[in-house]
Amino acid sequence: MLSLDFNNELIKAAPIVGTGVADVSARRFFGLSLNEWFYVARIAYTVVXIGAKVVDKIIDWKKATKE
């Protein structure tokens, strides 16, 4: 007799369904695939981190020249 554990099978399928939904929704914004959105996020993160470091160095430089 075939017996299925519904909760266990649902948990196994959740990541697959989640990835599919994320991929479909990602393609709706500017037509980029999910993989391309990771590139966009990484580039944006790098630019923000460089900007934060530059601002931090400017603040340190202003404090040093004030004294």
From Swiss-Prot:
Molecular-function GO term, any one: pore-forming activity
Any one annotated GO CC term: membrane
Domain of life: Viruses
Pfam families for this protein: Phage_holin_2_2 (PF10746)
4Fe-4S as UniProt keyword: no
UniProt membrane topology term: Single-pass type II membrane protein
Cytoplasmic side: 1-36
GO BP terms, alphabetized: viral release from host cell by cytolysis
Protein localization: Host cell inner membrane
Summary of subunit composition and partner proteins: Homomultimer.
Name of the protein described by the UniProt record: Holin
Organismal lineage: Viruses, Duplodnaviria, Heunggongvirae, Uroviricota, Caudoviricetes
